[in-house]
Amino acid sequence: MASALEQFVNSVRQLSAQGQMTQLCELINKSGELLAKNLSHLDTVLGALDVQEHSLGVLAVLFVKFSMPSVPDFETLFSQVQLFISTCNGEHIRYATDTFAGLCHQLTNALVERKQPLRGIGVLRQAIDKMQMNTNQLTSVHADLCQLCLLAKCFKPALPYLDVDMVDICKENGAYDAKHFLCYYYYGGMVYTGLKNFERALYFYEQAITTPAMAVSHIMLESYKKYILVSLILLGKVQQLPKYTSQIVGRFIKPLSNAYHELAQVYSTNNPSELRSLVTKHSEIFTRDNNMGLVKQCLSSLYKKNIQRLTKTFLTLSLQDMASRVQLSGPQEAEKYVLHMIEDGEIFASINQKDGMVSFHDNPEKYNNPAMLHNIDQEMLKCIELDERLKAMDQEITVNPQFVQKSMGSQEDDSGNKPSSYS
């Protein structure tokens, strides 16, 4: 092993033993070129370092190995990274979260290129747990995990990292990019869409669309298209975006989504045949955007919406009459829709198989059972927790030096503009 590499190993050991993590981070940031020049000796360097005691040194070596234009032995490197992430010292790597996240991004890209996304899911879950200060902290690796889960069509491993509300972002030594934030909410929305949790999906797409921005983002555009479709499926109309949404959404993103606005407009007429015609007209656009599946679900939701409207007019109705009024192919398809809607709790009804009559009922929920009271308690606790968080954030802003300086400056400006009472 070359003397420069030996010096690197000795410095890593010494600084790690002394607990001088800041200086160690400076060393590994400067050593990238040295390690890249000695690629053939890097496995020897790894053998000389202990993963637990010298986590930052091992991280630097693995990061450089993955940064090479071509990885000679991917399987060996994958095993090394997998072992490192599962056994490294979490306290140490939090000093170099930018490099650690960078290693995870490299691993993700390599697995995506090799069409092996499933292999990285468990590894990235461990990586996030090592990086996070708490479960409500968002890291750039969250987006990687969601991407792999989507590509592997294995959604559930991402849920523990999506079901929590994020209140903090891991800065990653200034390396955290807005792209990672947008991708987390866009991919997360797609995961929830795949699981048909449309309420949560709509929230995630909204977060991506309402992110403060000065320029058009392709991720925001795609989120906006899916936001329209999921709104129609869930609510039967397009939910209005909050007032704090960036002006670029109205100025640039809406004109780029004309086909989707047309779809929403036709949907509001409650006419399935017109909606089918519009879907045929814009099928190329919807297919290109990979949204045809959602568009078909919009059409299905319109049939359901029209069936729900019938419950407000009729107490009983034949399946044949229902199929005719809702523009379904026949009583069999009408029965299929009604059964699914009963199962999902979207309507309360029963079907008499003898005469093919559907009887509509009132909602049996009286809102007086223990489960309902428990739900109310849980919602109240969430409100109390939110109130406490807002107070803490308000206090944090109040003592922020920049805020104090700015508010003092504005007060001086105000007092300067007021005429003196003694003049």
UniProtKB/Swiss-Prot annotation:
Annotated signal sequence range: none
Q: Which GO terms describe its cellular component?
A: COP9 signalosome; cytosol; nucleoplasm; perinuclear region of cytoplasm
Family annotation (InterPro entries) = COP9_N, CSN3, CSN3_C, PCI_dom, WH_DNA-bd_sf
One Pfam family name from the record? CSN3-like_C
The alphabetized list of GO BP terms reads: in utero embryonic development; protein deneddylation; regulation of DNA damage response, signal transduction by p53 class mediator; ubiquitin-dependent protein catabolic process
Q: Which UniProt keywords apply?
A: Acetylation, Cytoplasm, Nucleus, Phosphoprotein, Signalosome
Q: Which SUPFAM superfamilies match?
A: Winged helix' DNA-binding domain (SSF46785)
State the residue spans of region: Disordered: 402-423
- Residues with the modification Phosphoserine, per the entry, are 407, 410, 423
Q: Where in the cell is it found?
A: Cytoplasm; Nucleus
Question: Which positions bear N-acetylalanine?
Answer: 2
Q: What is its main location?
A: cytoplasm
The UniProt transmembrane annotation reads none
Looking at the record, the residues that make up the PCI domain are: 197-365
Family recorded in the similarity comment = Belongs to the CSN3 family.
Q: What is its biological role?
A: Component of the COP9 signalosome complex (CSN), a complex involved in various cellular and developmental processes. The CSN complex is an essential regulator of the ubiquitin (Ubl) conjugation pathway by mediating the deneddylation of the cullin subunits of SCF-type E3 ligase complexes, leading to decrease the Ubl ligase activity of SCF-type complexes such as SCF, CSA or DDB2. The complex is also involved in phosphorylation of p53/TP53, c-jun/JUN, IkappaBalpha/NFKBIA, ITPK1 and IRF8/ICSBP, possibly via its association with CK2 and PKD kinases.
Q: How does it assemble?
A: Component of the CSN complex, composed of COPS1/GPS1, COPS2, COPS3, COPS4, COPS5, COPS6, COPS7 (COPS7A or COPS7B), COPS8 and COPS9. In the complex, it probably interacts directly with COPS1, COPS4, COPS8 and COPS9. Interacts with CK2 and PKD. Interacts with the translation initiation factor EIF3S6 and IKBKG. Interacts with ERCC6.
How is this protein named in the record? COP9 signalosome complex subunit 3
Q: Gene of origin?
A: COPS3
